[in-house]
Swiss-Prot record:
Name the UniProt record assigns to this protein: Phenylalanine--tRNA ligase alpha subunit
Subunit structure: Tetramer of two alpha and two beta subunits.
Organism: Glaesserella parasuis serovar 5 (strain SH0165)
Cofactor: Mg(2+)
Assigned GO CC terms: cytoplasm
Cofactor remark from the record: Binds 2 magnesium ions per tetramer.
InterPro entries xrefs: aa-tRNA-synth_II, aa-tRNA-synth_II/BPL/LPL, Phe-tRNA-synth_IIc_asu, Phe-tRNA_ligase_II_N, Phe_tRNA_ligase_alpha1_bac, Phenylalanyl-tRNA_Synthase, tRNA-bd_arm
Length: 327
């Protein structure tokens, strides 16, 4: 037991002299590790006579606990001293400005959607929505694009099976609305659409807004006036606007609308036309009694023109250096 007393005395003395947590950890390994002094003493119990073993074991545990308590106390003391020293070395200049809270902003595509919706809402158009997973009927057939129609090849459609697809246009919302509502109808349908295309001016997912107006006296003159007012309000300029004859299966007559750019060139912004009589018949509306016009615009296209963005893909890369410009 004389050896035990010496080990305890040496341990307590070494702990008291320890100047940092690292040296204290080295002492812990020396006395309590796998080959530490107290570990070897416990292993030596097997050589002690059986009748003396409990008493000897109790003394070793008592000595071990004494050394452990000293080690724990010294560790707590050293950690407190280190923390106080660190706090004393760090100072806060209360005259410095505080850290600013970064505020987010709307995505440029969302800004455009809000502007378009606000303009047409003030003219009595309501927002209607439909499913992004659409059926062949609502995406094509009901819009006067039957299975054999060559216009289907232009859509680069994502198909799930023979009947279900990711919608290539929000026009299906027009069909669903006309099925459940009676004229007069005045709606807009903003939403995501999908086409299998990816380059500087195309992405597999993009946004469209379509307008539909159906009434007994809807005509192309109204359509032209509406779009003139919208484009000048959206771009906040007295733009020169032109309508070019075009072709869409679901409108007749059809037109594409251009605005004069600052470089003196015409820039295409949207498509429009009078709703085709076949489309009205497909939803049970008599084309001899009612007429209508429809407008389709690409949100990213409008946003690119308004903010002079040259690469459509910039809208979807989440680059804060780009997005912060629109706050």
């Amino acid at each position: 037991m004389q050896n035990l007393e010496n080990i305890v005395a040496e341990a307590l003395q070494a702990v008291e002299k320890a100047s940092d947590v690292a040296s204290l950890e080295a002492l812990r390994v020396e006395y309590f590790g796998k080959k530490g002094h107290f570990t070897l003493l416990m292993q030596g119990l097997r050589d002690v006579p059986a009748d003396e073993r409990p008493a000897v074991g109790a003394k070793i545990n008592e000595a071990k606990q004494k050394a452990q308590d000293a080690l724990n106390g010294k560790k707590e003391q050293l950690e407190t001293e280190e923390l106080n020293a660190k706090l004393a070395s760090e100072s806060i200049d209360v005259s410095l400005p505080g850290r600013k809270t970064e505020l987010g902003g709307l995505h440029p595509v969302s800004i455009t959607i809000e502007r378009v919706v606000k303009f047409f809402s003030e003219l009595g158009f309501s927002v209607e929505k439909g499913p992004e997973i659409e059926t062949d009927y609502y995406n094509f057939d009901a819009l006067n694009i039957p299975a054999h129609h060559p216009a289907r090849a232009d859509h680069d459609t994502f198909w799930f099976d023979a009947e279900r697809l990711l919608r290539t246009q929000t026009s299906g919302v027009q069909i669903r609305t006309m099925e459940k509502m009676q004229p007069p109808i005045r709606i807009m349908a903003p939403g995501r659409v999908y086409r299998n295309d990816y380059d500087q001016t195309h992405t597999p997912m993009f946004h469209q807004i379509e307008l539909l107006y159906v009434d007994k006296k809807a005509n192309f003159t109204e359509l032209k006036g509406l779009l003139h007012d919208f484009l000048r309000a959206f771009f906040e300029e007295d733009l020169q606007v032109r309508f070019r004859p075009s072709y869409f299966p679901f409108t007749e007559p059809s037109a594409e609308v251009d605005v004069m750019g600052k470089n003196g060139k015409w820039l295409e912004v949207l498509g429009c036309g009078m709703v085709h009589p076949n489309v009205l018949r497909n939803v049970g509306i008599d084309p001899d009694e009612y007429t209508g016009f429809a407008v389709g615009m690409g949100v990213e296209r409008l946003t690119m023109l308004r903010y002079n963005v040259t690469d459509l893909r910039s809208f979807f890369e989440n680059d804060l250096r780009f997005l912060k410009q629109f706050k």
